[in-house]
Amino acid sequence: MLRYTGIAQALHWLTAAALCLLLPFVWVAENFPPGPVRVFWYMAHESMGISVWLMVLMRLTWRWRHRAPGYPAGTGRVAEGLARLTHGLLYGLLLVMPVTGYLMAGNGQDVPFFRVLNLPGFPHQEALGIAADSVHVWCQFALYGLIALHVAGTVWHVAVRRDGLLERMLPPQRPL
């Protein structure tokens, strides 16, 4: 079975790891009163969100130049269509959410990126901040559902179909 390239695999797993970090960062931030600790955790969340956005842009650029391997034989048109739809929606959300996050965080102030550089903010616009927050929250729940669907599809291929689909996104195994 053909595999994704090493770069595609690395970007996939780095994106997954960044998502696993940025979600708890905002949950932690919400549990602190306004102050420097809360600001730190929000900055970490925002910086990871920007990182996810950059990784998704790199993934899409790489994917445009390097086609994905085909699905295992017998996958079926419905399953392939569902996989394509899920991947497309995941990419879309992972591009939209950092933008809405920036529209919230940069609304009246600069947005620090890992305290290395500041992304320029823009003049405060109350309505824009409220709209961006609403879209961000709705996308958050859609993202949870799509991640669950993505993982469930992988488990189905590994445990039920046993068709080697997961191995496409893993480095080759060397014999011991």
Predicted regions and their residues:
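Membrane-embedded alpha-helical bundles that constitute the cytochrome b-like, heme-associated redox core
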Residues: 1-176
